[in-house]
Amino acid sequence: MSMVIGIGDLLVGYYWQWRDESQVEGKFMFYRAAKKTTPVKYQYTSNLSRCFLVFGIEPKPNKSGNFNNTMPDTEHSGDTTVNQVETIVTTVVVEQQVPTLVALDSLINENLKLASASQSSGWGFAHGLLVGQLSVVAVLAFFIKFFIFGNSSMARPLMVAPLINRKPAGVYKKGRAKSFSEVEDYDSETSSTQILDKTYYDVKTHQSESLDWFNVLVAQSIAQFRYEALNNDNIYHSLSDALSSSNLPDYLDKITITEINIGDDFPIFSNCRIKHSPNNSNRLEAKIDVDVADTLTLGIETQLLLNQPKPFTAVLPVQLSVSIVRFSACLTVSLISTADEEFQSSIKCVEDSENAIGDYEDDDDEFGGGAALMFSFSPDFRLEFEVKSLIGARSKLENVPLIGNLIEEKLKSWFLERCVEPRFQLIELPSMWPRKKNTRKPVDSESETAVDSN
């Protein structure tokens, strides 16, 4: 780098020296460019301290060392041509360090310019070297200031200021006297804002996502569930046990499963977007469109018993087949803390309302203070059924509309009371901390370890 700077300074110095010398050479070229036949008047003055008049014959100084006595005291002029005075350049007069031009012709006098005779070539080189050094220093200072320190100084306050103003509430130091219960409550509003900022997600302008990758994962899970359900008739035995263990009314006989179809298609999730919850603006929730175009069928048969005036007075065989052929809705999913007051109050409200109706299902689910997955469906859902019925022994009634409408309304009412907003379903999530009891390893690795030990 220093070598490049030195070479640059030398070039600048030589430029200034060449510039001083080129002014004199330019005067020679100017004279030679004049017409050869043009008369040229020359004149000189002698009342100056020192005068050089170049006619090809240099004036000689007198004994006192000056040239004044060799020249007349008055102005002289004469006529000649450029050919005769081609060696005549100009008259450079130095008087009190002020340059003076005595030209040979009025036209030349209007166009010629002389540099100061006191300026030497050595001073021109030194001047150029100094200017070169200063210019290089100025360029380096400009580059360092605006290209190295300029951007960092502007971007630093934007990144550091929030870290200075924010309290490290999640930092734990060993040996502290205060317990975690004394730490400030977690600010959900600040958390949601920071999450959106650090993930570069704008809830107002961000485009919805297709969730193709999520559909593949869900399809794999459903395929595994179907395999386990159909293996050794597991789903048949599970449903039969559930129906037989339930308390049936007196007018129903034992229920037998005649048909099971768990489908062969998969749900499609799409148009996923993150929004603020309308009930709590500090909580984020994902809204996903769900569409299921598949056939899920459950067929049963039973008997209606007429026990009056005595038991089993009359028996009416009934066969039903209910299929879900289409379901589409907007699914709302969010992660919440089960210790939130909003969650606890909503649970209590649901329990009170269901206890008043007498339809409360006590599952003995007690949620702690961990995280839970909350989901619900929008009220404008679409749920289509296909109900087939066959009633009677000898004279049979097939597909009675009244029975189909009754069953469809009952199923939709069951779905509304459990999964449709403002009600929701809650799934408690396991702890994210690794535990020894949850650790697993492949069977092959265990066998290889046993072989190596032997």
Curated annotation (Swiss-Prot):
Residues 1-128 are lumenal. It is a single-pass type I membrane protein. GO terms for biological process: mitochondrial genome maintenance; mitochondrion-endoplasmic reticulum membrane tethering; phospholipid transport; protein insertion into mitochondrial outer membrane. Residues 150-454 are cytoplasmic. It holds the Pfam family MMM1. It is found in: Endoplasmic reticulum membrane. One of its GO terms (molecular function) is lipid binding. Component of the ERMES/MDM complex, which serves as a molecular tether to connect the endoplasmic reticulum (ER) and mitochondria. Components of this complex are involved in the control of mitochondrial shape and protein biogenesis, and function in nonvesicular lipid trafficking between the ER and mitochondria. The MDM12-MMM1 subcomplex functions in the major beta-barrel assembly pathway that is responsible for biogenesis of all outer membrane beta-barrel proteins, and acts in a late step after the SAM complex. The SMP-LTD domain is a barrel-like domain that can bind various types of glycerophospholipids in its interior and mediate their transfer between two adjacent bilayers. This is Maintenance of mitochondrial morphology protein 1. It comes from Komagataella phaffii (strain GS115 / ATCC 20864). The gene is MMM1.
